[in-house]
Amino acid sequence: MDVTRFSIPVETAAPGGETNAYLIGTDPAVLVDPADRTDELDELVEARGVEHIVLTHTHPDHVGGVDAYAARTDATLWAHRGHIDQFRSATGREPDRLLWPGSEISIGDESDRTETITVLDAPGHARDHVALVVSDGGPVVCGDCAIRDGSVVVGAPEGEMRAYMSTLRRLWAIDPPELLPGHGPIIDHPREALERLLEHRMRRERRVREAVDAGAETLEEILETAYEKDLAGVRELARATVRAHLEKLAVEGRVVWDGERASPSEP
């Protein structure tokens, strides 16, 4: 199935300041994550015809063009069935249909629907995050689950670290030929990228736990120990990330965390 990527300039914390939108299929097509309207995307949407609009998640840097393209194409607008209010708030639109893990979105006429996109549950970066498998054994549109260079923000309270790491392992097990991310270039060695992201998270988690074991209690104290780099400009993101790691460690019984102070778990 044909997949076309559009890098759209938007206000985003992601490196490069762009979000990837995707058109999947040809006449008709599925539009994924229209972050904003652009002339180039307008032209191809008009040429191909869009039958469905789907979001990997409803963060602001992924939804800016939803209202315009929904009105322009009369496409079916899909929302995660567990997060309908969040969808309405983010897009200003009512969904036409609801999706959930395992849903299949078919493309084409009723008499010839041979192309399908399968929805995967992929929470962590966001609670409503899904990934999309393009045809059987095809690439996966992974949104903000993965990025080729750097790391993905998983910050509490919106992000959930335990879920995110499970999502990375799920994608690793699927082993798609490519990952099509929400930001940056296509990931053509998915398992290598997913292993790198998992190792990054496990390394940060070790440093958070070591900080707590060494006596750091508050977020600020743990932050200073868990990060070696200069946090100028990204301190709030780092703080949210540390909180997400602490919540994961607390659920697993490896630290005590009450939302304000941390302490080592009892042996």
Which residue stretches match the model-derived regions?
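Histidine-centered divalent metal-coordination motifs
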Residues: 56-62, 125, 183, 245
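C-terminal regulatory/interaction regions
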Residues: 211-267
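Metallo-beta-lactamase
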Residues: 111-123, 127-205
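Residue-level signal for the nucleotide or nucleotide-sugar donor/cofactor binding architecture
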Residues: 19, 64, 159, 237
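Hydrophobic residues on short alpha-helical segments
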Residues: 194, 198, 202-213, 243-247
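Active-site HxH/HxHxD metal-binding segment of metal-dependent hydrolases
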Residues: 10-17, 34-115
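Conserved beta-strand hairpin/beta-sheet module of binuclear metal-dependent hydrolase folds
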Residues: 1-46, 131-148
